[in-house]
Amino acid sequence: MADFGLFIGFGYPVRGRERQAVKVFNEAMEYYVRLQQQGDIESFESVFLEPHGGELSGFTLVRGDRDKLARIRTSDEFVRLSIRAGLIVEQFGVVGADLGERIGTQMRVYNEQVEDLT
């Protein structure tokens, strides 16, 4: 099971660019399917959120090896898709995410630092 991911969050489409938003979303889904088939990522899942008064309307969580995801994140195709998404949806962003066993590691380090500093 992957212990690292990319959280790719997005807000609502820019008014008047809804069709382009659908187009770029579909391009991204095709890209992630291809990455998964090639073994470059373990899995991905897209989520649409219910309206809640906030800016985040959905996200895609891409799971995989940290080094592979770092290469993907700086690849020409990922950068191109990110630029396209940023032009048609509000609040687009990509954030690295610790998953699985890395959560335990992060909590251990955090607790050690709390003990040292308090």
Regions found by a protein language model. Give the residues of each.
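Short S/T/G/P-rich N-terminal loop/turn motif that feeds into the first structured element of a domain
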Residues: 1-55, 64-74, 94-118
